[in-house]
Amino acid sequence: LRDHPVNKARIAAGRRPATSAWFWGQGSRPGLANFEQTYGIKGAVVSAVDLIKGIGKCADMQVIEVEGATGYIDTNFEGKAEAAIKALDSCDYVYVHLEAPDECGHRREAQNKVKAIELIDQKIVKPLLDALAGQQFKMLILPDHPTPIATATHSREPVPFLLYDSTETQEGVDSFTEVNAQNTGVFVERGPMLIKMMLN
């Protein structure tokens, strides 16, 4: 690329040269295991993010489209909760992916990141808990990765997770925070173990 005429013209114009090519788009379908055959339960995905929907499709999960799902703080939270609740009529497991806190982290919008988490609490978690009240169920809540405001990019630190079982009572943790999660001493070495913990 260094000697390409386009780069020579860019450098002559005082612009930075292109130093790499990133091919994005078409490809072949990855060989993911069928979710139902792997775990013995039927699953669905609710997300605005094409990557997440694609993973769901590749795992032969039901992918649910929600009108107004944007992946940002203006997403249709209520619609996602309603879709998840409805999906539980025919599925055993629903993965609801919410991108808003991550996007706010990338934009260094601390107030909106807090607001996004509060909206998830109010408009996703609470309606799901209300709809499932009196039933036996588990709910796993976690970010897929940290996106600290300070760096505005993904980082490698372990993420906190909350695994709720409607049949058990736990004492000693009164809120879901990184510090409280760390203080439990529970650490999952490999991410795929989380779903196994949830299903046991």
Language model region names:
Residues 1-200:
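Feature captures the catalytic ectodomains and active-site-proximal regions of enzymes
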